Amino acid sequence: MNEQSMKPYVIGLDLGGTNSVFGIV
């Protein structure tokens, strides 16, 4: 989950739905 802190927008786009909200934030 360290990557989410460094680049949450990438994680959100990666899932393309589940973490879309986190990606925007």
Curated annotation (Swiss-Prot):
EC code(s) of this entry: 2.7.1.2, 2.7.1.7
Protein keywords: ATP-binding, Glycolysis, Kinase, Multifunctional enzyme, Nucleotide-binding, Transferase
Keyword Nucleotide-binding: yes
GO biological process: glycolytic process; mannose metabolic process
GO molecular function terms noted in the UniProt entry: ATP binding; glucokinase activity; mannokinase activity
Activity regulation, free text: Competitively inhibited by 2-deoxy-glucose.
Known catalytic reactions: D-glucose + ATP = D-glucose 6-phosphate + ADP + H(+); D-mannose + ATP = D-mannose 6-phosphate + ADP + H(+)
Pathway(s) where this gene product acts: Carbohydrate degradation; glycolysis; D-glyceraldehyde 3-phosphate and glycerone phosphate from D-glucose: step 1/4; Carbohydrate metabolism; mannose metabolism
Family membership noted in the UniProt record: Belongs to the ROK (NagC/XylR) family.
Role summary: The enzyme has great affinity for glucose and mannose.
Subunit structure: Homodimer.
Name the record gives this protein: Glucomannokinase
Lineage: Bacteria, Pseudomonadati, Bacteroidota, Bacteroidia, Bacteroidales
